[in-house]
């Protein structure tokens, strides 16, 4: 259809022909490259030539009697509106005149690019949804198109492939709409990372209560890091700070306990030493008394021995006296 619209300067004004033209979708057909020297098909009432590199978007769709004869091909022929038409079709895949609220004449003028579109184009999703709605409520009016000089065989040859492609291509809007309908139900459902984050957030109030103080103090850093997987950074920092505080507190308590134990030990040793000093003092006093007693006794013995020696020398009974 794009080739006939681009090469023909005049279009049929019949309402049935316009409705038949408008019902075609540009991208429902296979896109293929046609060679420069394409031979004409024998046995067809109408023949056409296309420029080299042109894109065939649709089979012959308009009646042969209502389309003027195609001009002869020349290499110096300026580019037609076919590229613009293909560009418009590729960007707005399903351009429907009813979706734009256009008349058939405006739709044809917009397709061939001779006049600007009266209304601003809507978004792609608007075209898609409107086209999907249109095909649900207006199913294939061109299949029963009876006339305008086209035989039933020619119409069947073009309508049936279009019918086949139309049924194959119509599910994508519904399939594309189904993920969009499933998005509100799929997004609230948490993914794996969101589940881990939700689990960590759910245990936010009991993160510090998950491990006892003894477990935090006795647990190694590697084991603690393995248990803290899945928690947020703030929770890990808070729990490690608590562990550090408990460790410092335990270290302080241990040092205080050691100091107290050492103090008790020193006090016990001091008491024992004091007792030993008292015992030694008592021993010294006892020895001093014994010394004094021995001294007095020694003095007494010395005095008594001197007297005995003096009395024996003065006695006349001694042998020296007689000599």
UniProtKB/Swiss-Prot annotation:
Effect of residue 297 to R: Loss of SUMO modification, increases transactivation activity, increases macrophage differentiation and inhibits myeloid progenitor growth
Keyword Lipid metabolism: no
Covalent link Glycyl lysine isopeptide (Lys-Gly) (interchain with G-Cter in SUMO), residues: 32, 297
Disruption phenotype: Mice show a defect in frequency of respiratory rhythm with a fatal apnea at birth due to lack of neurons from the preBoetC region. They displayed renal dysgenesis with abnormal podocyte differentiation as well as tubular apoptosis. They show altered actin-dependent macrophage morphology. They show a reduced number of cells expressing insulin and glucagon. Embryos also lack the abducens nerve which normaly innervates the lateral rectus muscle that is involved in eye movement.
Family membership: Belongs to the bZIP family. Maf subfamily.
Primary role: Acts as a transcriptional activator or repressor. Plays a pivotal role in regulating lineage-specific hematopoiesis by repressing ETS1-mediated transcription of erythroid-specific genes in myeloid cells. Required for monocytic, macrophage, osteoclast, podocyte and islet beta cell differentiation. Involved in renal tubule survival and F4/80 maturation. Activates the insulin and glucagon promoters. Together with PAX6, transactivates weakly the glucagon gene promoter through the G1 element. SUMO modification controls its transcriptional activity and ability to specify macrophage fate.
Name of this chain's protein: Transcription factor MafB
Organism (species): Mus musculus
Gene (UniProt): Mafb
């Amino acid at each position: 259809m794009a080739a006939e619209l681009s090469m023909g300067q005049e279009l049929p004004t019949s309402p049935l022909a316009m409705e038949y033209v408008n019902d075609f979708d540009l991208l429902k057909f296979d896109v293929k490259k046609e060679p420069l020297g394409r031979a004409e098909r024998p046995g067809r009432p109408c023949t056409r030539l296309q420029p080299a590199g042109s894109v065939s978007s649709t089979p012959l769709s308009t009646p042969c009697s209502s389309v003027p004869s195609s001009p002869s091909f020349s290499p110096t022929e300026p580019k037609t509106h076919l590229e613009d038409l293909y560009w418009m079709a590729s960007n707005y895949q399903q351009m429907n005149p009813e979706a734009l609220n256009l008349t058939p004449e405006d739709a044809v003028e917009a397709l061939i690019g001779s006049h600007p579109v009266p209304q601003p184009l809507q978004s792609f999703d608007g075209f898609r949804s409107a086209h999907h709605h249109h095909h649900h409520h207006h199913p294939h009016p061109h299949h029963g198109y009876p006339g305008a000089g086209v035989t039933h065989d020619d119409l069947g040859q073009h309508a049936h492939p279009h019918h086949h492609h139309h049924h194959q291509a119509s599910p994508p809007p519904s399939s594309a709409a189904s993920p969009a309908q499933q998005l509100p139900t799929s997004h609230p459902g948490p993914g794996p990372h969101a589940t881990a984050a939700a689990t960590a957030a759910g245990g936010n109030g009991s993160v510090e209560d998950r491990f006892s103080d003894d477990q935090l103090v006795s647990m190694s850093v590697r084991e603690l890091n393995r248990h803290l997987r899945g928690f947020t950074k703030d929770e890990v920092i808070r729990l490690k700070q608590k562990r550090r505080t408990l460790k410092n507190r335990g270290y302080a308590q241990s040092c205080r306990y050691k100091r107290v134990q050492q103090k008790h030990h020193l006090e016990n040793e001091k008491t024992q030493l004091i007792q030993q000093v008292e015992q030694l003092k008592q021993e010294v006093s006892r020895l001093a008394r014994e010394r004094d007693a021995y001294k007095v006794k020694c003095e007494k013995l010395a005095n008594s021995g001197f007297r005995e020696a003096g009395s024996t020398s003065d006695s006349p009974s001694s042998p020296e006296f007689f000599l």
